[in-house]
């Protein structure tokens, strides 16, 4: 595509991208059709936050560096052979090389910077020059499935909050949060599924309206008084999207001596330039200032974050169960002088880490056919293969009833080391015998047990102090490449922003072949096993027990593990 001089090559309002459905291939095999469809699915207007700008979610998390790069990626995937591998560097296709049929068809590296230069200032300079792209986690790795992708993890967190703080009873209680973007938009539905009501503050009215249309939020309010009244008057859990600035609303609740039961936040605070609206600013003024004076925007945003975090700390002191939901807002506040910003915990060490110790995390799959029936059939297969987990069955039932598909039908389902390979093999067999209309792709969030180093989120407070060691996601990516995942990605800065995380992703295509079965056996065992390994190495007993039960070979721990079998 040609761009007129001065036009942003990342913006094209004339295009609407949707993944092909059905069994007619544009590429030469399903192994290359799969990444093609999932790339396009990431930019489906029913999936992406700002598809015309290639932005999928998370501030400026993109699927491709610019539209010329997108077009070239599509062109290459359509011609790629099953013994070739495409290399993608920060959203730009840079090479096609000979490999072999069991190698990944695509290898992706996004947003990676040498540590000394791993900050937003340097990234933004490279981004403006067209030399880099922010891939977030599943945006640049082509496995975003809309807000459903984080619903179950958020649901599991809220269930854990209820168990820990309210004896398992969420009825009559409410959650305060901020942000209704691609990730934050999952919060209202997850909260009501877990039995809580919620007020979610969002400064962009179009995002509230979108969550209303897709069933993720129940009501809209334009004043705090209206939102509080909706929650108070409802006999059942209800979610409210409140139009406003999170810092303003959180501070107003403190001033009015109104204390929610639970307080958290999922604004895009990880990116102070693009992801957080300063107090007193309109959306239009912020957009204008981003073009004129980036440093002023960043400073104003971080000052507002400090106000919000101070309010969260005060609400915590008044009895609210307060948690950071992984957007690095505590770090931003700390940099603005809020010395006790980390006095409330992150959600992973507080509620999720025991799951990670067993390799349990956000396993997800999508139906390349585009037919919802393929997902419903896989839902049933999960129940058949895991019959003794009523909590999981309840999740699948709620998901079918309450979650609208965005783009290609997909499902998120938190399972671990002992189940992922079994499910993958079953799905592959369903493709082989014609139960499913087309292949399934299986992937996950980079927020998983063995695929991320993020000291302010997934690896916060590791018991051996290894929070910042990022060898683990690198090893995870290398092992998934060696095992034959269909595409593998290695990113920096997802979730918490530049300089604060490194993480890897994988996707594998179940095309019904024996070769796929062999790859599934390797990848869907090894991938969660690296999470068990990482946590066992850090000293977690749950992980050691799991490693022993699953027969992992961990040389420095084998003697200890042998006593646990």
Curated annotation (Swiss-Prot):
Q: What class of enzyme is it?
A: lyase
In terms of Gene3D superfamilies, this protein maps to: Urocanase like domains (3.40.50.10730), Urocanase superfamily (3.40.1770.10)
Q: From the Swiss-Prot or TrEMBL record, state where the protein is found.
A: Cytoplasm
Its recorded reaction(s) are: 4-imidazolone-5-propanoate = trans-urocanate + H2O
Looking at the keywords, is Zinc present?
no
SUPFAM superfamilies attached here?
Urocanase
| GO molecular function per UniProt | urocanate hydratase activity
Instruction: Quote the cellular component terms of the Gene Ontology held in the record.
Output: cytoplasm
Q: Tell me its EC number(s), please.
A: 4.2.1.49
Superkingdom of source: Bacteria
* One GO BP annotation of this record: L-histidine catabolic process to glutamate and formate
Q: Which family does it belong to?
A: Belongs to the urocanase family.
Query: Can you say what this protein is called?
Result: Urocanate hydratase
Q: Which organism is it from?
A: Vibrio vulnificus (strain CMCP6)
User: According to the entry, what is the taxonomic lineage of the organism?
Assistant: Bacteria, Pseudomonadati, Pseudomonadota, Gammaproteobacteria, Vibrionales
Q: Which gene encodes it?
A: hutU
């Amino acid at each position: 595509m040609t761009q007129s001089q001065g036009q942003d090559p990342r913006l094209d309002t004339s295009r609407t991208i949707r993944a092909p459905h059905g069994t007619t291939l544009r590429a030469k095999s399903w192994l290359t059709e799969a990444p093609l469809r999932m790339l396009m699915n990431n930019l489906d207007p029913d999936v992406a936050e700002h598809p015309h700008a290639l932005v999928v979610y998370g501030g400026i998390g993109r699927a491709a560096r610019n539209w010329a790069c997108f077009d070239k990626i599509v062109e290459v995937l359509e011609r790629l052979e099953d013994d070739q591998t495409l290399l993608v560097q920060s959203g730009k296709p840079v090479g096609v090389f000979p490999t072999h049929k069991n190698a990944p068809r695509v290898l992706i590296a996004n947003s990676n910077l040498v540590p000394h230069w791993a900050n937003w200032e340097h990234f933004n300079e490279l981004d403006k020059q067209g030399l880099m792209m922010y891939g977030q986690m599943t945006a640049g790795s082509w496995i975003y499935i809309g807000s459903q992708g984080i619903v179950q993890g958020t649901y599991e967190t809220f269930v854990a909050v209820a168990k820990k703080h309210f004896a398992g009873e969420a009825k009559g209680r409410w959650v305060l949060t901020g942000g209704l973007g691609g990730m934050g938009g999952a919060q209202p539905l997850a909260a009501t599924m877990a039995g809580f009501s919620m007020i979610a503050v969002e400064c962009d009215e179009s995002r509230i309206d979108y969550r209303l249309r897709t069933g993720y939020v129940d009501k809209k309010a334009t004043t705090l008084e209206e939102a509080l009244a909706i929650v108070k008057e409802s006999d059942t859990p209800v979610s409210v999207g409140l139009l406003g600035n999170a810092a303003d609303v959180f501070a107003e609740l403190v001033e009015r001596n109104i204390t929610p039961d639970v307080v958290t936040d999922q604004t895009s605070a990880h990116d102070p330039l693009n992801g957080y609206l300063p107090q007193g600013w309109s959306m239009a003024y912020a957009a204008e200032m981003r073009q004129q004076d980036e440093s002023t925007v960043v400073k104003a945003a971080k000052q507002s974050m400090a106000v919000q975090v101070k309010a969260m700390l005060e609400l915590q002191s008044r009895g609210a169960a307060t948690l950071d939901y992984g957007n690095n807002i505590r770090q931003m506040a700390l940099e603005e002088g809020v010395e006790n910003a980390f006095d409330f915990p992150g959600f992973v060490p507080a509620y999720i880490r025991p799951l990670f110790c067993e390799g349990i995390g956000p396993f997800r799959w999508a139906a390349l056919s585009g037919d919802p029936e393929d997902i419903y059939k896989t839902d049933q297969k999960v129940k058949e293969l895991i019959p003794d987990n009523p909590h999981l069955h309840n999740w699948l039932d709620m998901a079918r009833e309450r979650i609208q598909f965005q783009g290609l039908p997909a499902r998120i389902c938190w399972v671990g080391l002992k189940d992922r390979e079994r499910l993958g093999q079953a799905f592959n067999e369903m493709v082989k015998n014609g139960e499913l209309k087309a292949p399934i792709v299986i992937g996950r969030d980079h927020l998983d047990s063995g695929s991320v180093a993020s000291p302010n989120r997934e690896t916060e407070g590791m018991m051996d102090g290894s929070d910042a060691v990022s060898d683990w996601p690198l090893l995870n990516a290398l092992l998934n490449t060696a095992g034959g995942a269909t595409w593998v990605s290695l990113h920096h800065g997802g979730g918490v922003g530049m300089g604060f995380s490194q993480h890897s992703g994988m996707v594998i295509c179940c095309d019904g072949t024996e070769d796929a079965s062999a790859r599934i056996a390797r990848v869907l065992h090894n991938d969660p096993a690296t999470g068990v390994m990482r946590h066992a190495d850090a000293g977690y007993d749950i992980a050691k027990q799991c490693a022993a039960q699953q027969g992992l070979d961990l040389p420095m721990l084998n003697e200890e593990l042998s006593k646990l079998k």
